């Protein structure tokens, strides 16, 4: 009786590709319009002023300026805004 499984019969050996989620531009960084700021699943970060949200909840800059992260509201939600360059 074999004490090792035959080659090719293992139940392991697969893994999903990483999705490269997370913050792409940090607070204080300069961005141009269209730059991706955060890639996320769901709204961990909410869109503030001059920030748009894509169908996959990606946050992107609508204007040129500096990235600003802030916490607001009774639920302490995290918002990302773009402060236009003056």
UniProtKB/Swiss-Prot annotation:
Keywords, sorted A to Z: Ribonucleoprotein, Ribosomal protein
One MF annotation (Gene Ontology) recorded for this entry: structural constituent of ribosome
TM helices/strands, residue ranges: none
One GO CC annotation: cytosolic large ribosomal subunit
Alphabetical list of PROSITE patterns matching this protein: RIBOSOMAL_L27
GO biological process, one term: translation
Family per record: Belongs to the bacterial ribosomal protein bL27 family.
UniProt cross-references to HAMAP family, sorted A to Z: Ribosomal_bL27
Protein name (Swiss-Prot/TrEMBL): Large ribosomal subunit protein bL27
Native source species: Marinobacter nauticus (strain ATCC 700491 / DSM 11845 / VT8) (Marinobacter aquaeolei)
């Amino acid at each position: 009786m074999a004490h090792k499984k035959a080659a090719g019969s293992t139940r392991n050996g697969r893994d999903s590709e990483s999705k490269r989620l997370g913050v792409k531009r940090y607070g204080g960084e300069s961005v141009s319009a269209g730059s991706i700021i955060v890639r996320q699943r769901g709204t961990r970060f909410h869109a503030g002023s001059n920030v748009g949200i894509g169908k996959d909840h990606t946050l992107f800059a609508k204007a040129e300026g500096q990235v600003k992260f802030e916490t607001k509201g009774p639920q302490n939600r995290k918002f990302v805004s773009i402060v236009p360059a003056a």
